[in-house]
Amino acid sequence: MHYTTLLLSTLLVGTALAQPTNPPAKTPKKAPKTQPYNPCKPQEVIDTKCMGPKDCLYPNPDSCTTYIQCVPLDEVGNAKPVVKPCPKGLQWNDNVGKKWCDYPNLSTCPVKTPQPKPKKGGVGGKKASVGHPGY
């Protein structure tokens, strides 16, 4: 019995020593995934099953010309947010009772005022003078 155990141990150690010792392949590190924006409210999904024409629809904080529709996944309120486009020229209107794509002047999308680009060459587009005019 001892001879068999000794022989088996010797074979296992010998096999382990005979294996090539290649360094493990480097796997690139991936940045952790951030959770995508999900406005789907479990209670609304449970209550409405998102079946009504205005149920489970939300504004998209990233775009005025799209909205988010929640698609139910199960009975406990989990839902998948799906970004849907508005027709060309329309924006999302999230007013109670509406929740549809509407003309921009009727949309509830926050208006983003474009910031003016700074002009090159100093203040107001003119080069700053080096000396004081009285000297």
Swiss-Prot record:
<dbReference type="GO" id="GO:0140403">
    <property type="term" value="P:effector-mediated suppression of host innate immune response"/>
</dbReference>
<comment type="function">
    <text>This necrosis-inducing peptide induces a hypersensitive response on Cf-4 tomato genotypes. Race-specific elicitors are compounds which only induce defense responses in genotypes of host plants which are resistant to the pathogenic race that produces the elicitor, but not in susceptible genotypes.</text>
</comment>
<feature type="region of interest" description="Disordered">
    <location>
        <begin position="19"/>
        <end position="39"/>
    </location>
</feature>
<feature type="region of interest" description="Disordered">
    <location>
        <begin position="112"/>
        <end position="135"/>
    </location>
</feature>
<dbReference type="GO" id="GO:0005576">
    <property type="term" value="C:extracellular region"/>
</dbReference>
<feature type="propeptide">
    <location>
        <begin position="19"/>
        <end position="29"/>
    </location>
</feature>
<keyword id="KW-0732">Signal</keyword>
<feature type="domain" description="Chitin-binding type-2">
    <location>
        <begin position="47"/>
        <end position="111"/>
    </location>
</feature>
<keyword id="KW-0843">Virulence</keyword>
<feature type="signal peptide">
    <location>
        <begin position="1"/>
        <end position="18"/>
    </location>
</feature>
<feature type="disulfide bond">
    <location>
        <begin position="86"/>
        <end position="101"/>
    </location>
</feature>
<keyword id="KW-0147">Chitin-binding</keyword>
<dbReference type="InterPro" id="IPR036508">
    <property type="entry name" value="Chitin-bd_dom_sf"/>
</dbReference>
<dbReference type="GO" id="GO:0140320">
    <property type="term" value="F:PAMP receptor decoy activity"/>
</dbReference>
<keyword id="KW-1015">Disulfide bond</keyword>
<dbReference type="GO" id="GO:0008061">
    <property type="term" value="F:chitin binding"/>
</dbReference>
<dbReference type="InterPro" id="IPR002557">
    <property type="entry name" value="Chitin-bd_dom"/>
</dbReference>
<dbReference type="Pfam" id="PF01607">
    <property type="entry name" value="CBM_14"/>
</dbReference>
<protein>
    <recommendedName>
        <fullName>Race-specific elicitor A4</fullName>
    </recommendedName>
</protein>
